[in-house]
């Protein structure tokens, strides 16, 4: 049974288009997500530092409770 040349060409074209799609930087959201996670972690760390500098006792505890999940998410994403 002979396979038509058009089928070979179609398989090669589909394979190449798929590999080119993965090679584009738009298909890689990891760098964008990493930059966003880093910016979020830095902003939350600044918010925690500001809250710790204030004399009210409840705010540092509240700030730590809010910031810790973001720091955990950043560290797991970076080193996990």
Swiss-Prot record:
Its main location: secreted. Vertebrate-selective toxin that causes pain by targeting voltage-gated sodium channels. Belongs to the formicidae venom clade 1 family. One of its GO terms (molecular function) is toxin activity. Expressed by the venom gland. This is Myrmicitoxin(1)-Pr1a. It is found in: Secreted. Coiled coil: none annotated. Keywords: Amidation, Ion channel impairing toxin, Secreted, Signal, Toxin, Voltage-gated sodium channel impairing toxin. Residues 1-23 form the signal peptide. Residues 24-57 form a propeptide. One of its GO terms (cellular component) is extracellular region. The modification Phenylalanine amide is found at residue 79.
């Amino acid at each position: 049974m002979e396979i038509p040349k058009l089928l070979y060409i179609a398989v090669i074209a589909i394979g190449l288009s798929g590999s080119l799609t993965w090679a584009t930087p738009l298909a890689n959201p990891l760098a964008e997500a990493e930059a966003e996670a880093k910016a979020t972690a830095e902003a939350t760390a600044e918010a925690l530092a500001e809250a710790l500098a204030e004399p009210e006792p409840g705010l540092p505890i509240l700030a730590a409770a809010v910031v810790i999940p973001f720091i955990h998410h950043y560290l797991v994403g970076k080193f996990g």
